[in-house]
Structure formats: structure tokens, C-alpha cells
């Protein structure tokens, strides 16, 4: 892989801007996929601020350009987008070269499809100093090479990656990258947080509930869901009598929901009939205090029957009352003489009463 693969992002710094400090991150993910016989490799570059996708470039687009993925990035002017698009196209060309080089490093034929994936970014603390810098690549899935936490050395995964490591060491690539991570990366992050302040610095608390899934051998799975939360950091734990069951539970990675929020679940297998002894605990900065949830069994069939019976009785009482009220009203209108009230030819009293009852029920409901 050529050293040019390091040139994934902008290197220009912006003047510092003021925004609420705190742990924040700026990450760029890149993917290059060769496809022999189908044209040039596809290249994609996606940027995230605090787990929110904010820019994207796709070489397969009808008009390949770096484009905003959130409204607040539309505040950037044409010069910004022209520069970002040109940077992405330069990166695309660099990755084409890298794909060819790696074929030679691994002694692979030109007929197969291969993939390079990369990530670069920075995490900052409440004082806006760098907490952690990242630069890492994978080839056809497994790790290839990564910048170490000291921001000075590299970890190469195999003999082929050693070739790249030596080239980058000779070129002083780590020093250049460290300057970017400690400087421009932090300033760009500050800039983006200022633009997206109303969205990125708000919180959406999770909507949490527990579901129940029967298993064999007298066991059930309790799954604790947290949905619709932002930012992505959240803690889900299962407890039994106050003791955390971290080793026994299945915890999935936090996933984007597609609407700017996130979702996550934690599952635990428990004995049938003992579900109420287990509690799920949810911690998120959008919550005034942590949530504690148990599985709530649905009402029994007997309870449903009682509810239905009560509703039927109430309905019958209401209908009878409406019919009586109608008859009383008609009697008053005829001076109390029932003989003046006659049915339409061919009608039956029960049908007429039922129709009028329906009208009265509808009208009274509308006036409520």
C-alpha cells in the first residue's frame, strides 16, 4: 500500500469556535472494492460526528461528489464541497493503486474482487485535547495495519503489512498523521459541532421495554430493548437480586435506527416462572435517572373475559337507557298518548329502536 493512502482527510485547520465541551468524536470510514471486468473499483467515504453520518462520497453515483447527509452541513459554502470532492477523488485514485499493490504483496491473481477498508479519526475530551487518534486498515476482512495508541508506531498484521509499515516508517507517516490528529482533526470536529449544535448536542432518552421469548427445557429468554435514543452511548445490564449478570447476558452492538437515533438490546436466559426476579437497568444521559424494568406478563384469559363481560353489560345498559329516553321523549311530544305514534309500513319495532339508538349514541359521542 502506498503512503498516499494516509491522505484521506483535509489537513487545513480552522479557527477555533466555541461550543459545549465534552467527549466527542470525528471518524471517517473508507471502502474500496475492486471488480475486475466491471470497470474501476468502487470507492466510498463516509464521515461521522458523534456517530451521526454527516457527509458521504460514492464513486458510483451519477455525479460523484462529497454530499451532506444532514441539514446543518448545508451551511457550508460551495468552496468547501468542491475541496472535499476533490480530496475524495484523490483518495479514490490512491486506493486504486493500493489495491494493485496488495495483489502483488499477497501474490494474488487479477481476476478476483478484493476490498480495502479504513478508518481514521479523533476522540476529544472535555478540555478539547486529543484522547485517542485512529488510523487502521483491513484487507479482505482481516486487519492489515493500524496506528498504535502512542501515535508513533504501527502494528502490522502479517508479512505483507510489514512491507507497508517499513515504507510508512521511512516516509515519517506517523509524524504527519499525529500532527493532523492533534490539530486539524480536533479543529474540524469543533467546527462541525458548532454547525450541528442544535442536533448533535441534544439528547433523546431511550424508550425501553422487556420482551418474553419461550425456549425449550423450562427456560425463557428475556430481552431488554432500548430504542430511539441519542447519543449512542448507553448501558444495558441485567441483574438478579442486585447482582449484575454481565457474563451471562447477550449484548448486541449499538445500531443506528435510520432516523438519527440508535437502538440496542440485552438478552438473558432465565428459568421459566422466575422472570420477575430479574431486572433490566438502563443508563443514558438523556434519562433523569436510570430505568429499572421487569417483564410484565400480559393479563390472563380470565381477566380478559371479565373485562369483556363488563363491557357487554355496560353496553346493554346504555342501549336500554337510550331506548327508554327516546320512548319517553316521543310520549311527551304526543301528549303522553302512545296511540299517536305509529311505525312505518313494513317496519318492526326492534329494528326502528335499534336504528334510533345508534343515531343517539353517535350524536351523544360527537357532543362529548
UniProtKB/Swiss-Prot annotation:
Residues 112-203 are annotated as: Alpha-2. Residues 296-303 are annotated as: Connecting peptide. The chain crosses the membrane at residues 304-330. It comes from the Eukaryota. The modification Phosphoserine is found at residues 350, 353. InterPro entries: Ig-like_dom (IPR007110), Ig-like_dom_sf (IPR036179), Ig-like_fold (IPR013783), Ig/MHC_CS (IPR003006), Ig_C1-set (IPR003597), MHC_class-I_related (IPR050208), MHC_I-like_Ag-recog (IPR011161), MHC_I-like_Ag-recog_sf (IPR037055). It is a single-pass type I membrane protein. Pfam families: C1-set, MHC_I, MHC_I_C. Residues 1-21 form the signal peptide. One of its GO terms (biological process) is positive regulation of T cell mediated cytotoxicity. Keywords: Disulfide bond, Glycoprotein, Immunity, Membrane, MHC I, Phosphoprotein, Signal, Transmembrane, Transmembrane helix. Glycans are attached at residues 107, 197, 277. It is found in: Membrane. Residues 22-111 are annotated as: Alpha-1. PANTHER family: HLA CLASS I HISTOCOMPATIBILITY ANTIGEN, C ALPHA CHAIN (PTHR16675:SF251), MHC CLASS I-RELATED (PTHR16675). This is H-2 class I histocompatibility antigen, D-P alpha chain. It comes from Mus musculus (Mouse).
